[in-house]
Structure formats: C-alpha cells, structure tokens
UniProtKB/Swiss-Prot annotation:
UniProt enzyme class: ligase
Subunit: Monomer.
Protein name per Swiss-Prot or TrEMBL: Glutamate--tRNA ligase
A Gene Ontology biological process term: glutamyl-tRNA aminoacylation
Note on cofactor: Binds 1 zinc ion per subunit.
EC code: 6.1.1.17
Predominant cellular place of this UniProt entry's protein: cytoplasm
SUPFAM superfamilies: An anticodon-binding domain of class I aminoacyl-tRNA synthetases, Nucleotidylyl transferase
Cellular component GO terms, alphabetical: cytoplasm
UniProt keyword list: Aminoacyl-tRNA synthetase, ATP-binding, Cytoplasm, Ligase, Metal-binding, Nucleotide-binding, Protein biosynthesis, Zinc
Length: 485
C-alpha cells in the first residue's frame, strides 16, 4: 500500500469550507493524482463540542462541486475504514495502551482544579503552559486503585526532558526542537475520545498515508507527532506544511472574522474552476508566465516542492481577473445559461436576454455584477444634462441636441428595428452632418441609458430596448437639452 502515493483531506465538520481548508484539500488531491495515487476523505469529529449540524454536508457538497473526488471515505467506504474518527474510538484506546506498555505514555488523574492552578502559575510567570509530569511515576497499584474508584483520567504522551527531536518538512526544511520544550500532550481525553493530534498519527499510519498536507500552524506540533511515530516504530510520512493565507500583510484569512468561504465566493458569482485555479496559486509557483490552468493541467504541473514558505495574500482583484478569464472562455450559450437567474432577478421588462448575454459575456468578471449592469434597461435613470458634454467625443449641449433631433425622425421611420438597421441610420447621419462618430453616437447612448458607463454602445442598447422605449428616451433627452436654452 505504501508504495502508492496516498494523501488525505481530514476536515472537522465545524461549519463552512474555509479557503485555507479548500487549498489543503486541493493540494492533497493534486499530489495524489499527479502520481496516480489515492485521495482519501477522513472526518475528524473527536472534538464533539465544536461540531456543527449540516457541516458534514458542506464538506461532501464542496468536494462534489469542485470535482475533488475522493477514492475512499465515509460515504463510499474503502479497505481501511471506518473513515470517521468517532467510529474508531476503540482503535485509539488500543494504541494508547500499547504506548503505556512501551513506557511512552502514562495515565494522568490530575483534576481540572489542579491543571487550572498550573496554568495560572505559568501565566503569572509569563511562561508557556506545560504539564509538570505529576502523574508520571504512579505505581500500577495506585493506577488500578484510582481507575477502580472511577477517578477521571486522561492518557498523556511521555516526552523526554533532555536531547532534541528533529524532523524534515518538504517546504520548511529540517527543524529541530529541544525536548524540554515538548509538553506531555494528552492522547486520550477523559471522555475516551482521542485528541486531534493522536488520532491523526494513528489514522495516517493505519490508512497508509504517504504525504501529510496541512497548514504551517501545525509545524510546532510535528516534533510530538514524530515522537509518536518513533515510539510505535512506524515510518514517518512526508510532511508538506503550507504557508498561511493572509487577508493582507498583517492579518490571516480567518473564518472567525467572516472572511470568504468557498460557499461565499460561489454565492458572489465566482466560478468553481476559477476559485480552484486561484487557490492553487496561493503559495505554489508553477514557474513561467502561465496562470490559468485547467484541473488536468494542474494535476500535470503540480510539484509540492515549489510551494513557497512565504505567506500568500488573498488578492480579491486577482481572483476577479481570473474569474473574468474563465467567464470569457465559456461558450455564449453556457454564459447565457449561468446568467439567466441574474436576469430574472434584475429585469422587470421583457427583453431579449440572449442579446444582453452577447453584450455582457466579455464585459463581466463576476456573475453577481450582472444586475448592476442592467439597471438602465428597466427604467431610464435620472441623469444630469452635463453627461452630454464629453471632451473626447467633442460633444456640447448644442451639437448633442442637434444629433438627437436629427436622428429621432429617422429612427421613427425605421420599420424593421434591428441592430444593423439602427447602425445604418446613425452612421448615415454621421456622414450627412460631416462630424466624428462620437458627436452622434455619444448623445444617443446617453439618452437611451442615462449612464456614463454601459455594456455596449448606442446601437446595442437601442436594439435591446426596442423601438418604442428608445424613441421615448431620445425625446426625454431632447427636452432636457432644450430646457437649457
């Protein structure tokens, strides 16, 4: 089993799929698939107090939507299940007892009050809290007596106080820690469930995990993990600790602070492919100029040794740009299908939405921008006549009024209202008046939209609005300009 690359995504069902969690899943998936390996889903629910109802569905749905399909997991089974930690309780107790037999762990009966006192003393001395090994030398008789009396206990790792523990991480290199800094961490809690740290090591070994991908915040725990591997006589997996994702230079991206989850980004109109592509580049450098990768290309190109140590800043502008690239790469039909719900939300008039899609397809970066681009189609917005003055277009109040008054009867006479016919009428007027295009087209665009920036120009907007509405808006424009005289 260990000859084959096996990675795992092991989330806790505690709420939304945070961007950092999704990147961990993606990197683990890419490492496995780059070498035709297995990607395993394991649910870490040992911290029962933090569990959130419905969070498990979020995990399954996210993996399904993103296409990060697991080869083994709670929902599909596999050869090394169960894949939910709360269903493996007896396994952890068995392995904790093996450590006690080896002299690598011990029972601790210290009360909450005693531990609170130790913590308070540590805080007063401004030192990190470490358990004082009070129960390390209890005799078998004392232990048996306390267990028989029903005294609550935990099982702790027995760490040496001299020497050092070293480990290698593929991103951060060789790291060595003095054993005197290692706390005798709890392996089995008083409720009989394992701690996250202990369950991880046992499960990663029993499930044949070859590469452990996780955030750099777990670097400090890795020496304790290594001590467990050594105590059991197990091979240590390859560690890939990923740099943190930052909101800006000084603040980490955090779901506690309400920063974007995968669900939030999808709800804002980002495409799943763009989100995954962008997240892949948060810390990983493929080399070269290429930035837009399909999943197949990511699998082929991904090399975890090219992950940077430096924190990656989540740049919403960059994500938006990338999303725009993906939207433009869609077929018009596919874009139209994705835009339809936004049209239904934004439009109050019966318009040709396929024509609107032709306008927006190359102009929208995020689907949620669609409604704000369409407001003028419903009703002509109140606007200032000053909009008719445009230095670059060489328009004034006077020539704007002339253009609108000249084009109105020509458009009124148009029997077949199409884009091409509207364009022909307007361009013929440009020739007749012997002016630059903008002198005619800018006033028309202003009159029909009431906005300085619109998707599409005068011809497209007039075509979509229809004859009656276009003529009505041009008349309003004429009246606005006449009122200035």
């Amino acid at each position: 089993m260990t000859n084959k690359v096996r990675t795992r995504f092991a989330p806790s069902p505690t709420g939304y799929m945070h961007v950092g969690n999704l990147r961990t899943a993606l990197y683990a998936y890419l490492i496995a698939k780059h070498d035709n390996g297995d990607f395993i889903l394991r649910i870490e629910d040992t911290d029962q107090e933090r569990l959130v109802e419905g969070a498990l569905d979020v995990i399954y749905n996210t993996l399904k939507i993103t296409g990060l399909s697991h080869d083994e997991g709670p929902d599909i089974g596999g050869p090394v299940g169960p894949y939910v930690q709360s269903e493996r309780r007896n396994i952890y107790i068995e392995y904790a007892e093996k450590l006690i037999e080896k002299g690598e762990a011990y029972y601790c009966f210290c009360s909450k009050e005693r531990l609170d006192m130790l913590r308070a003393n540590s805080e007063a001395l401004k030192r990190p809290f470490r358990y004082d090994k009070h129960c390390i030398d209890l005799s078998k008789e004392e232990i048996d007596k306390k267990i028989a009396e029903g005294v609550p206990y935990v099982i702790r790792q027995k760490n040496p106080t001299t020497g050092s523990t070293s480990f290698h991480d593929e991103i951060y290199g060789d790291i060595s820690v003095d054993n005197s800094e290692l706390d005798d961490m709890i392996l089995i809690k008083s409720d009989g469930l394992p701690t996250y740290n202990f369950a991880n090591v046992v499960d990663d070994h029993l499930m044949g995990i070859t590469h452990v991908v996780r955030g750099s915040e777990y670097l400090s725990s890795s020496p304790k993990y290594n001590r467990l591997y050594e105590a059991f006589g197990w091979d240590v997996p390859i560690y890939v600790h990923c740099p943190p994702i930052m909101k800006d230079e000084h603040h980490k991206l955090s779901k506690r602070n309400g920063d974007a989850s995968f669900e939030d980004l999808m709800a804002k109109g980002y495409l799943k492919e763009a989100i995954l592509n962008y997240i892949a580049l948060l810390g990983w450098n493929p080399g070269g100029e290429k930035e837009v990768f399909s999943m197949k290309e990511l699998i082929e190109a991904f090399n975890y040794r090219n992950i940077n140590k430096a924190p990656a800043v989540f740049d919403t502008k960059k994500l938006k740009w990338m999303n725009g690239e993906y939207i433009r790469a869609l077929s018009l039909d596919k874009f139209h299908e994705m835009a339809l719900p936004h049209y239904k939300e934004a439009l109050t008039r019966d318009l040709d939405t396929k024509k609107i899609s032709e306008l927006l397809h190359t102009r929208v970066e995020v689907l949620n921008e669609i409604p704000e681009q369409l407001d003028f189609f419903n009703n002509l917005l109140e606007y200032s006549p000053e909009m008719y003055i445009h230095k670059k277009m060489k328009t004034t109040y006077e020539n704007s009024l002339k253009s609108l008054e000249e084009v109105l009867p020509r458009l009124e006479a148009l029997e077949n209202w199409t884009f091409e016919n509207i364009k022909e009428v307007c361009m013929n007027l440009v020739k007749e008046l012997e002016v630059k295009n903008g002198v005619v087209l800018w006033p028309i665009r202003t009159a029909v939209s009431g906005k300085q920036f619109t998707p599409g120009g005068a011809f497209e907007i007039a075509d979509i609005l229809g004859k009656e509405e276009t003529l009505e808006r041009i008349k309003i424009g004429i009246n606005k300009l006449k009122a200035l005289q």
